[in-house]
Regions:
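Structural scaffold elements adjacent to functional motifs in cytosolic proteins
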Residues: 66-68
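Short, surface-exposed ligand- or partner-binding patches at beta-edge/loop junctions that are enriched
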Residues: 107-108
């Protein structure tokens, strides 16, 4: 259940995916809507920090954590060493178990899902970056 000031639909706007839920207002209220272009300009782009793979590796050596938001089956095929797997669709439920003092570098195959994951984490006060180019830009994809 959503409360006053809560938001929904960010994942679809960020990753260019279809909405994954319908929301029904249970009582009278006002719904504010922000179009996709305005959302990207005002909220998404300023909140996202993109890092190159090599820089991400340096950050992980200093204590950052790779956070892979792909499906478990995708993660099992290949993933970055010591990566944590929380599928994007579980992010809101599972992020309460994450250490807020850690820097998370969110990754997926292309960067689309990871940008949604990093946005959700940033919105909740986490230090989150997105792996630029996704796993396709890593040594794993080059093999």
């Amino acid at each position: 259940e959503l409360g006053m000031g809560d938001t929904f639909g960010e994942e679809a706007l960020i990753s260019d995916a279809k909405r994954n839920a319908s929301v029904i207002m249970a009582s009278e209220g006002t719904l504010m809507r922000l179009g996709k272009d305005d959302f990207r300009t005002l909220l998404n782009e300023p909140m996202l920090d993109w890092v190159e793979y090599e820089h991400g590796c340096d950050l992980v050596e200093k204590g950052a954590v790779w956070l892979d938001v792909r499906l478990p089956s995708e993660f099992e095929n290949y993933h970055l060493p010591d990566a944590l797997n929380i599928p994007l669709y579980f992010m809101r439920m599972k992020m309460k178990n994450l250490d807020t003092s850690k820097h998370f570098i969110v990754c997926c195959d292309s960067g689309r899902r990871s940008s949604a994951g990093a946005y959700i984490l940033s919105e909740r006060g986490f230090h989150a970056s997105v792996l630029k180019g996704g796993l396709a830009a890593t040594d794993l994809a080059r093999k």
